[in-house]
Amino acid sequence: MPARASRPAPGLPARAGLGFKPEHYATLVEQPPDLGFFEIHAENYMVPGGPAHAQLAWLRERYAISVHGVGLSLGGHDPLDARLLAGHRQLQRRYAPDSISEHLAWSRHDGRYFNDLLPIVYDDAALRRVCAHIDQFQQCLGQPILLENPATYVRFEASHIDEAQFLCELVARTGCGLLLDVNNVYVSAVNHGFDARAYLARLPLAAVGEIHLAGHARQRDAHGRAVLIDSHDAPVDEAVWDLYEYTLALTGPVATLLERDGNIPPLAALLAETDRVAACLARGLALAA
């Protein structure tokens, strides 16, 4: 069995969680599920009031909460958006979430916003830039964040730092934690032809504070080659489940989120997947005992 990493200080409970969808709210109120936490996308709650906040307040009274940002563009060349920083700070003050996270990606350039999580060049300049942005975000919040590893579809010739090493450097230099998206690891490994398990072994696993699981789509590029897309619109693939169990053998039990952002089924279908997450975590806990 692989050597297991020591765990960071507790944040989210080491249980199964689910991304919150407003269309499930009535069902949740009628029969609250036995879950450890819910995750919300920060930008959907950067308004002063309304139904979204009423629903989030209900969740916060009953569950741990993870706030996941998608638009701060930590990897971009532009300065961080002051309005988004203020919005994150307001959410933190209002709900005291158990975890706050963002992506290793960029989505803003020259003041324009792109509705996507775009890849960065892994070089020394990018490392300094992302470190500075993480430091700024963490200083704004007064707490460490978790940074999510990306799913990628292209690589840059200018990159001279391995992605896993880049993440190690970010964690070491900023004190941030890692949000380990296992589906992203699998998608990138297939797309670029590297060994997913070897990649995991090079990560700073002691810094992992949350794991994400999601489904992906299979497409073909212009040359007919298979490409996996981190689509979040399908059940978790069996290969990703296998990689998740391998990951838990390295990390021990970690708070694990099931993501579903497209083709959203009834809540019961998602809870069947979170039950499988809980079973994996229970096996991991038994091994750790």
UniProtKB/Swiss-Prot annotation:
InterPro entries on file: MbnB/TglH/ChrH (IPR007801), Xyl_isomerase-like_sf (IPR036237)
Family: Belongs to the UPF0276 family.
PANTHER family: UPF0276 PROTEIN HI_1600
Stated name of the protein: UPF0276 protein BB1291
